[in-house]
Amino acid sequence: MKILVVSDTHGYTDKFDVVLEKEQPVDMLIHCGDVERDEDYIRAAAGCPVCMVAGNNDWGSDLQQEIVTEIGKYRVFITHGHRYYVPFEMDRLKAAAKERNAQIVIFGHSHMPYLQEEDGITFLNPGSISKPRQVSFEPTYAIMKLDDLSLIHISEPTR
């Protein structure tokens, strides 16, 4: 299973389209928020199941604040991250992941890619394809793959 993970697109559907075209086919899309009113467009363009949460800029959206779902054998916690004060601290997000028995946490908000395993939990932030903030200012996203052995392989966020 190939999963495209994006966050913080902030209404830049042209950049989303470029990434989607480059990575197709994908089996699932996860969007970690700050969609900014483009959720219908993203769902239609994806052509696959979509998990999408609201970010701090998604005012008035019907999107959920958080999703806990099963992907393969993994319990996955998806959130934007702003309610947990990322990137300034990870302790609250880690505690929330443990409360939800999550093995994988996927979040956004910081616009900076992050991939780390702590206490048996994998934390992934794909960064931003529209407004990156890391030192290189390169747009980033992530690809997650679940293989037949139900092992997860998360590639480094790429541009």
Walk through the language-model features, giving the residues of each.
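Beta-strand-turn-beta hairpins that frame and shape the catalytic cleft
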Residues: 1-3, 68-77, 117-123, 144-151
